[in-house]
Amino acid sequence: MLLQGANPRLDVTVPAPLNGLDPEASFVQLRLEPSPVLKPTSTVRVLINDELAGIFLVRDLRQEPVVRVPIPALPPGERFITVSVQPFLSISDDICADLNTGNLLLTVGRDSFFELVPRVPDTTVAGFLRLVYPQLTLVVPANLTPEAAEAALWLYSLLSHLFPQTPILWSNRPVAGAQVTLEPANFTPHLQHEITPEGSRLRVAARRESILALYEEWKRAGLVSRGIQVAAVADLERALRANRLSFRELGIVDPLLRGFGSQSLVFNFNLSQLGGRPRDLAAQLDVIMNPVDGRAGDRLTGYVFLNGVLLRTYNLTGRTQLNETVTLPTRLLRRFNQLELRFDYGASLGNCQGSLTPLTLQVRSDSSGLLWSGYQAPNGELQEIPAVLQGSGRVGLGDPQLLPAAAYLVGALSRLAARPLLPTLEVLPKEEANLETGNFAWQVIVAGPDQVELNSPIRLGSQFEIINPLNQQVALAAQPQENLGLLQYFLLQGKPTLWLSWWGSDPALAERLSRGLADPRTRLANQLQGNVLTAYAAAPNLTQVQSWDLTPQGYRVRYPGRFSWQLLLWQYRYWLVLVLALLLAVGAWNVYQRLAGRPESPIPS
């Protein structure tokens, strides 16, 4: 995290242990790297829950940038720990000149971390979900019943949503480290947390109610017991969202800026939080600030950016409030988006030395947010996944052995979704069949090319090539002896459909592709583009993934030995246009001659 300006601020909040904190063993370790041109007497303050915990000189940080700050005992009932980093940076006695250099910088390193030791180990079910793990394992028994298989799919999807930054493995046997075990449906209690020498264990009965309870109750106070028997739980709430999302609902609570120069507030949101790609979108801004005295020559300017594109500017000199609604062009929207509010405070030359009143500005989270009306129809591009996966869904398995591949894929989508995806699981018939979406709003198919017949971008029934239509160069040729994993996205009867399959004789490549998407360390799921993904085994532990745009504006698919009039028309399109233009010119000339020719004078008799 790069902090810029004379007096920036960084706040990081984490949940406190439920049973209290051991102050003798708990600390936060920070790597603070100042700009080399800063005045040695510049300082960095560290506060914990708004109480001063340490002051560090830039001179000392240059010698040792890593500092360890003890976390004191928390007051009763305190649920969160907030660490604030507040630098006070300068280069000279002229703050205006310092700001103009752009060198008032402090970097908070990526290797900074919290070490939180609970006073008493938290053995509640909620305690398992509150911890941060380097890796989780879902242990699933072999030979599952259809009901247990669906429960395993749901549980993996839910864990991926609750632990979006944690790799989650699928295994059929216990392993060391933190793990979640799917128990038989008659296991009691339905939810149980155990702490063993090998690590934390969460045992979950293979019941619909148990998995729904994990999601619906963990964020409340319902899972504060070591073992829980679930009597009943409501279905996952699917209430229609009002077409407004406040900044508080985005997890941003009344952000505050205080300092000089150029400062920014960044609000991150994704299409899933909006429920899809809106037809129109606007940002409602409610900002309060201390007035900047324009009579003295001070200036305050505000800017609004969406994904790096400047949309609006405001002259805020002398104002104490900004209450505006800014239209956000939907053409600029991506899967993940950034709305940035930037404020430039320029002091007059006469006010640059000595005591200078900083700008203090705050955004009201409840009255600020995003507004939209209606949604665009799906367009068949992976950029809109998983935002368009709304309502009830279905996962169709060609074989029960493909369940891990399906779980990895659904889990990858749940990591990016506003709510976990809990689709119905069905096993497809062995014979080839045409699939219909039925009453489902979307579906995921995991099956071989000889088992389903779908109007997908690539027909897998025969050899195919992906070609560049501009130069006819072959970008990918699927030879009979090769093995590929494929993920294709298209619309079936207007409904989003994902088909995970393979080319060749190795179905394991489909699982390798979905496992790569599910691993948050690869960030593959965040970068989905086009409408087709291909994967091949570049090495035993390396899967090479490539995305393709096979829409009419992108690459083309050619099937050797099969005539394609579309490719023929595209290949000779310029000659066809030239011939058509010549024919039109000849026709126009003939018409002109007939209409413009002079009539012959009659011969007198």
Residue positions per predicted region:
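Solvent-exposed alpha-helical segments and adjacent loops
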Residues: 1-605
